[in-house]
A protein has these predicted regions:
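Hot-dog-fold acyl-thioester-processing enzymes
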Residues: 1-2, 49-148, 207-217
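HotDog/MaoC-like acyl-thioester-processing domains
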Residues: 3, 8, 12-81, 157-217
Length: 217
């Protein structure tokens, strides 16, 4: 059991080399983390720790955990259609050796024996990726920009697990012409055991340069 929280301060692009600095904090079993690019710009800040995070009790649990099929007609997400306090449609996915291999060879490259081979468990980033997947399961989102997350990991995900994910909308707002949505995610296995809970912030409508200039002056 462990947790992570992080915020993206500056964009990173393919080819960037990031230095990761982890500093143990005074509190037990927690570390502050920074990811810094070659120009010494801090791009990501966060904390990680063991056990349960202080904020883990703040999550809103979804009650709509019956998954719906892909291919349903999706509407556009707007500030008006975000439906604060409503559960999104749930989705399911099987964690297989093939899924693990694809993820660790194409998205989060690693040769850590925990996450590769014939009997891997899911990489924590695979779990974190569920938030954006659930948003796109419910809405037609051409592009988005993930800005912040809190993740409470509760169980590992071994091969053969069927994962069911659901989300509950916490808020939607505009900031500097960008349109944000904030939602909580609950992941469970086929036996109804909790795998993880997430709180996710993302820009679902990225402002154009003209829109930002109009707001910022």
């Amino acid at each position: 059991m462990g947790w992570a929280e992080y915020s993206f301060r500056q964009p990173t692009i393919p080819g960037d080399q990031l230095t990761i600095r982890a500093t143990e904090e005074n509190t037990a079993n927690s570390w502050s983390v920074e990811m810094i690019n070659e120009e010494e710009v801090v791009c990501v800040v966060g904390k990680v720790g063991l056990g349960k995070a202080d904020w883990s009790s703040e999550f809103v649990r979804s009650t709509s955990l019956t998954p719906t099929e892909e291919g349903q007609k999706k509407k556009s997400l707007t500030l008006e259609t975000a439906e604060i306090g409503v559960d999104w449609a749930a989705k399911k996915a099987d964690f297989t050796v093939e899924a693990a291999t694809e993820f660790t060879s194409e998205k989060q490259r690693t040769n850590n024996p925990l996450f590769v081979g014939s009997n891997p468990i899911a990489h924590p980033s695979w779990t974190a990726g569920w938030a954006e997947q659930l948003m796109r399961h419910n809405y037609d989102i051409p592009s988005s920009m993930h800005t912040r997350s809190r993740i409470q990991h509760l169980n590992v995900v071994p091969v053969g697990t069927q994962v069911i994910g659901a989300a509950h909308v916490v808020g939607a707002y505009e900031r500097k012409a960008h349109h944000f949505v904030n939602f909580d995610v609950l992941l469970q296995d086929q036996a109804g055991e909790d795998i993880a809970q997430l709180r996710h912030w993302t820009i679902f409508k990225i402002a154009t340069l003209e829109e930002r200039e109009n707001v910022l002056g």
